[in-house]
Amino acid sequence: MTMTIEHGLQLQDRRDGVGGLYTIATLGSHSALQILKGARDEGFNTLAIANRETERLYRSYAFVDEVITIDKYSDFMSLVPELEQRKIIIVPHGSFVAYLSLEDHKKMRIPYFGNKAVLDWEASRELQRQWLTRANLKLPRQFRTGAEIDRPVIVKLYGAQGGKGYMFVRDAHDFEERASLLARQNYILQEYVIGVPAYIHYFYSPLTGKLEIMSMDRRYETNVDSLGRIPSSAQAGMDIDPSYVVVGNSPLVLRESLLAEAFRMGEDVVRVSQEICGPKGLFGAFCIETIITPDTNFYVMEISARIVAGT
């Protein structure tokens, strides 16, 4: 692994945190710009750990004080001994989930914003479903085998991959014809709920005991969000498979009459987390990913126990 270090601002001893200054650090990916801009606004030093394709981007922002370049994000753990000698606080996001293992997260001794006990419940689709069920959230039906499928489903791969590899399946026969595409991959078979996607961004502070809804968004996915521009009659014979790769996020203002239920869901998710993960439970930023049906019911697809890209 090769590494370079660049200082964006020449403040006295910023890198060593002299004078009590902490540095907020994160991988240069996913939602790093939101995290580092917010950290700078709150008076912290900032550090982006980028790869060779992204280092130029992060060096171009004035609120990024320092950039460390590594060959690939999975090399992050080799930096840990150096970072442990500094006044660093890691703020994780989806790329930490994608590129580091659970064991990597747990053995890190750098101060880490978030409760690592939550990671097991987020990473396991089965445990996550137990958590959300105990919080009295409506969940789409889940199928254990392809033979059980009796309605349209979406096949979801494990991990934070921005929808990559997701697959729409009409019925059991359709699944069997395409199952070879899923060889040696972990996935779930989830009922496809028709409605409006709404990703609700929360922040829970254990210091004040208060929960906030900060924002909401919709995700733009290629190519599924462009298929509606093609008349259904024209789609016949085109042999187009919908894909769900996220390419961007758009702000969403939720109808006010739905806010009470959105808030209730967040409160109950936090409450149950304190039962299953210890008194600290889930804190900081998190996102409940929902579909809102025509009868204005929320169906929860999953939870991200951290900041998400649209926050």
Predicted regions and their residues:
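Conserved ATP-binding module of the ATP-grasp superfamily
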Residues: K138-P140, F168-Y199, M214, V224-L227, ...
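Conserved N-proximal alpha/beta basic substrate-recognition cap immediately N-terminal to
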Residues: N51-V153, Q161
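ATP-dependent carboxylate/phosphate-activation module, predominantly the ATP-grasp catalytic core
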Residues: Y202-Q274, S304-T311
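Short beta-strand scaffold segments in enzyme catalytic cores
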Residues: Y199-Y202, E289-I291
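C-terminal active-site "lid" helix and adjoining low-complexity regulatory extension at the edge
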Residues: T2-I5, L9-L11, D16, A305-T311
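Conserved metal-phosphate-binding beta-hairpin within the catalytic cores
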Residues: V270-G310
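ATP-grasp fold ATP-binding core
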Residues: L132, D150-F168, Q185-G195
